[in-house]
């Protein structure tokens, strides 16, 4: 395993539990109508809505006869997406994660929900996945590609394991695209991204890079959308809870994991501001592997 991948695995191992008081088995933002107010009581519904909205955007078939045979979640966290998709859509789901600790938790959640026959999880590297070519009808990734420096290899691997005609979905933070007159981001913008990235093991690029990386690959029907305003209420709520007295005390009671949680929350304030300022965006990209 490459050195930066080992660091990423350690980061995720230690980061388990950062959002579990609010997000439970999901390690991503929720989806809301722009301008909505997020509430703790309704937050879990917004988390699964993000998954459903992504599938809808990718034109997930309503006809049960045309639904995918199986799904791969690349960078699956503690398994929430696989568990939701397996239950709601009744398809086989597999998750891969570089963090042994998170895979262990995901396996426990699957067992607790009686889904061992429909859901499984592997410890593995997203840049070198242990699956044959064309193994999956749906390949999805949420909040993973921004944590990897070699984005070209990541995208190639997603396309490689996708079957002919399979749907590929990527949800990710990116930085703003450059204007025609710009050669690079402003120095202050680069400093902000470095500060966020160094804290949460992330390397940001513009959305146009993803499209360019897909261009030479056997894919078609590329669709993109900016969902920054849709996750804004979720981001606000997560920060509010994390910085509340209850949130801080709850994390401190977790010992080492709690200190890690607090350290990981601090750059979230920078990320939220970068989203508000338009420096960072949250996007969805889908495409279909050519037949």
Curated annotation (Swiss-Prot):
Residue positions of motif Vacuolar targeting signal: 133-139
Region (SAM motif II): 134-142
Tissue expression from the record: Mainly expressed in roots, but barely detectable in stems and flowers.
Classification via InterPro entries: Methyltransf_11, MTs_g-TMT, SAM-dependent_MTases_sf
Record field: pH dependence: Optimum pH is 7.5.
Catalysed conversion reaction: ajmaline + S-adenosyl-L-methionine = 4-methylajmaline + S-adenosyl-L-homocysteine + H(+); norajmaline + S-adenosyl-L-methionine = 4-methylnorajmaline + S-adenosyl-L-homocysteine + H(+)
Region feature (SAM motif I): 71-80
Biological processes, Gene Ontology terms: alkaloid metabolic process; methylation
UniProt keyword annotations, A-Z: Alkaloid metabolism, Membrane, Methyltransferase, S-adenosyl-L-methionine, Transferase, Vacuole
Known pathway: Alkaloid biosynthesis; ajmaline biosynthesis
Family: Belongs to the class I-like SAM-binding methyltransferase superfamily. gTMT family.
Extent of the signal sequence: none
Functional summary from the UniProt entry: N-methyltransferase involved in the biosynthesis of ajmaline-type monoterpenoid indole alkaloids (MIAs) natural products, important plant-derived pharmaceuticals used in the therapy of heart disorders. Catalyzes the indole N-methylation of ajmaline to produce 4-methylajmaline. Also able, with a lower efficiency, to mediates the conversion of norajmaline to 4-methylnorajmaline.
Thermoactivity: Optimum temperature is 30 degrees Celsius.
Name of the protein in question: Ajmaline N-methyltransferase
Annotated region (SAM motif III), positions in chain: 161-170
Source species of the chain: Rauvolfia serpentina (Serpentine wood)
Cell compartments where the protein resides: Vacuole membrane
Molecular-function GO terms, alphabetical: S-adenosylmethionine-dependent methyltransferase activity
EC number annotated for this UniProt entry: 2.1.1.393
């Amino acid at each position: 395993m490459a050195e930066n991948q080992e660091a990423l695995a350690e980061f995720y191992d230690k980061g388990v539990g950062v959002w579990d008081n609010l997000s439970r088995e999901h390690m991503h933002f929720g989806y809301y109508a722009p301008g909505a107010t997020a509430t703790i009581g309704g937050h879990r519904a917004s988390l699964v809505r993000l998954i459903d909205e992504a599938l809808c955007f990718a034109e997930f078939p309503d006809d049960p006869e045309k639904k995918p045979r199986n799904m791969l979640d690349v960078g699956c966290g503690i398994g929430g997406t696989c568990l939701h998709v397996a239950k709601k859509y009744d398809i086989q789901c597999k998750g891969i994660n570089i963090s042994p600790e998170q895979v262990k938790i995901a396996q426990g959640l699957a067992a607790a929900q009686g889904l061992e026959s429909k859901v499984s999880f592997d410890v593995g590297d997203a840049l070198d996945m242990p699956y044959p070519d064309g193994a999956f009808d749906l390949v999805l990734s949420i909040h993973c590609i921004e944590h990897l420096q070699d984005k070209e290899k990541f995208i190639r691997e997603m396309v490689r394991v996708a079957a002919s005609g399979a749907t590929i979905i990527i949800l990710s933070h990116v930085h703003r695209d450059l204007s025609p007159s710009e050669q690079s981001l402003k120095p202050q913008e680069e400093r902000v991204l470095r500060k966020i990235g160094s804290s949460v093991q992330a390397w940001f690029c513009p959305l146009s890079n993803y499209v360019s990386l897909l261009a030479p690959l056997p894919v078609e029907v590329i669709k993109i959308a900016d969902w920054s305003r849709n996750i804004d209420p979720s981001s606000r709520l997560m920060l509010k809870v994390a910085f509340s007295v209850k949130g801080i005390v709850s994390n401190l009671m977790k010992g080492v994991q709690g200190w890690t949680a607090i350290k990981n929350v601090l750059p979230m304030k920078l990320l939220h501001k970068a989203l508000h300022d338009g420096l960072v965006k949250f996007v969805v990209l889908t495409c279909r592997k050519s037949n």
